[in-house]
Amino acid sequence: MEQTQTAEGTDLLIGDEKTNDLPFVQLFLEEIGCTQYLDSFIQCNLVTEEEIKYLDKDILIALGVNKIGDRLKILRKSKSFQRDKRIEQVNRLKNLMEKVSSLSTATLSMNSELIPEKHCVIFILNDGSAKKVNVNGCFNADSIKKRLIRRLPHELLATNSNGEVTKMVQDYDVFVLDYTKNVLHLLYDVELVTICHANDRVEKNRLIFVSKDQTPSDKAISTSKKLYLRTLSALSQVGPSSSNLLAQNKGISHNNAEGKLRIDNTEKDRIRQIFNQRPPSEFISTNLAGYFPHTDMKRLQKTMRESFRHSARLSIAQRRPLSAESNNIGDILLKHSNAVDMALLQGLDQTRLSSKLDTTKIPKLAHKRPEDNDAISNQLELLSVDSGEEEDHDFFGEDSDIVSLPTKIATPKNWLKGACIGSGSFGSVYLGMNAHTGELMAVKQVEIKNNNIGVPTDNNKQANSDENNEQEEQQEKIEDVGAVSHPKTNQNIHRKMVDALQHEMNLLKELHHENIVTYYGASQEGGNLNIFLEYVPGGSVSSMLNNYGPFEESLITNFTRQILIGVAYLHKKNIIHRDIKGANILIDIKGCVKITDFGISKKLSPLNKKQNKRASLQGSVFWMSPEVVKQTATTAKADIWSTGCVVIEMFTGKHPFPDFSQMQAIFKIGTNTTPEIPSWATSEGKNFLRKAFELDYQYRPSALELLQHPWLDAHII
């Protein structure tokens, strides 16, 4: 029974458990000294709290309350009941949200009704029904979608342009309702995979699955809201006894759940990151003006046209298929045009089509007659400013001061500078595009303050090799390890940054592997040193952990396998990376691992191996191996220890030794303390980490040996 403390100290019964209505109005009037109006209130049947709290001036005048002072006292007291009710409702809502925000991972697993099994995801269909799908062993979006498509009822399958049912994964989309922004969010592949394999993402029990030509129906949205409210209801029953796991749900109101939803589309004039990750090339190709805001439109159009023609010529000459993962703008435009042609060809009369085309194959643009390709090129010609435009060398100028590094891959002679996609102490990283081929790139750019600093070429490379080795050894002694490094001047810092970039160039141009970021070349231009690297859509392991939290173990094994394959390739080339960590492991939107940042990497010579020379204290402290901290040896086994630390990162969402400072971590590692192995890892996972954290580097397994570990065996259903 609820009570309200009066000014005189008397408690009034205002709850629903009142046994008599008259005492309430009587006590109400006695409290404010207006009992002379009691008979009037009773005659008008204004005797309960619900009736009294809606009193106003006109009603009081009709009741005969003519004194202004009495009316004010009655109105103030009656309005306080409404205020108390609102405060009570707000307090209840606050208590609910506090319970939600205080939940931990353990509390989520308590509610088996929401996610019955560990590896299960609930997909909502457009008829309002829901399907539970086991995604264990599915490491990409295609495999997840295929499992669901096999179980779809016939009436919910997508149809192609001919009205035929299709089960191709590219014909289906996945949405999720974002109640913090009150929008429908279309998931990209990397988002779908991450949500499905995350333990703490409550969205995994209400993903909406529709065909590409549809948007989520009212029935699907209604089912999603019911599951969402059921989730909140279940979470509210758990006491505030654990950590702040679901703080992102704070601030969600009832109005958000009931308001009108909009689809979260990208705006044409706004550069968008996908969950704080680099956007895919397909998206950039549809918004070039947005991603290259300071580039002349004529130059952009010319590049698009030349890239398209270049891709079309290569397709015909080499009969090469169009790669779905290409970062080349011409390939993307060609693929889009090809899709349109396929749709048009399928719409032709079948009898007419059979007399001209092989009915067993749908011809692709790459295999069409030359005149067909010319026709499409002419269509793209409409994008150009003038069909009689000057040649590339005239357009970009003949007196360019770019000096290119000779590499196995042609260095871009002309390139378009796009939006900034990252920055650091060395400078900035920009989105770039080869002006001739249309290839998208990530361009590391650092200002060269000293005019004597130049890009090394093959002409002076051999002559300066001994000097460079000596400089490298001097640089190793004062390399950055957090608080350990104390450079004397800003000029020394800048010089070291440039040296690190030049060192990175020399190593990268020898590397050509799927799991290593591709190096396109370097140039010195306008006082800047540019390094042209492969553009990797997506983000690093570190950024994904920050956005999504720890990974599922099946996803960790998939990424670890690829990291070790890349590390094994480096070691075969006698290169030690020396800075393997989550921030230097990129994951593209297809789930492919790319190792990057070779600024402090080292190429071992046979002399290095024989002498087993004293190691320098280089790298990132929390990922350092004991022999590096003790400076006892320089071996490839340091990368194995660091890879184990990355596995710890993916398991926990934090670096090893998260409770220690850098100096404390150096002391711990130096006294043979290994990182704590997650207790929730499988027995094989724990065994893998124990081998990676072998204190004696001579007994620590190599990358090739670890690749044969049972933990990395793929168990794909």
Curated annotation (Swiss-Prot):
Binding site for ATP: I421, G422, S423, G424, S425, F426, G427, S428, V429, K444
One BP annotation, GO: response to pheromone
Catalytic activity: L-seryl-[protein] + ATP = O-phospho-L-seryl-[protein] + ADP + H(+); L-threonyl-[protein] + ATP = O-phospho-L-threonyl-[protein] + ADP + H(+)
Enzyme class, UniProt record, top EC level: transferase
Chain positions found as Phosphoserine: S323, S465
Pfam families membership: Pkinase (PF00069), Ras_bdg_2 (PF14847), SAM_2 (PF07647)
Biased composition (Polar residues): 452-466
Domain Protein kinase: 415-712
Molecular function GO terms recorded: ATP binding; MAP kinase kinase kinase activity; protein serine kinase activity
Active site as annotated: D579
Domain SAM: 20-84
The EC number(s) this enzyme carries: 2.7.11.25
Subunit structure: Homodimer. Interacts (via SAM domain) with STE50 (via SAM domain).
PANTHER family per record: MITOGEN-ACTIVATED PROTEIN KINASE KINASE KINASE 19-RELATED, SERINE/THREONINE PROTEIN KINASE
Function recorded in the entry: Serine/threonine protein kinase required for cell-type-specific transcription and signal transduction in yeast. It is thought that it phosphorylates the STE7 protein kinase which itself, phosphorylates the FUS3 and or KSS1 kinases.
Stated family: Belongs to the protein kinase superfamily. STE Ser/Thr protein kinase family. MAP kinase kinase kinase subfamily.
Official protein name in the record: Serine/threonine-protein kinase STE11
Species whose genome carries this gene: Saccharomyces cerevisiae (strain YJM789)
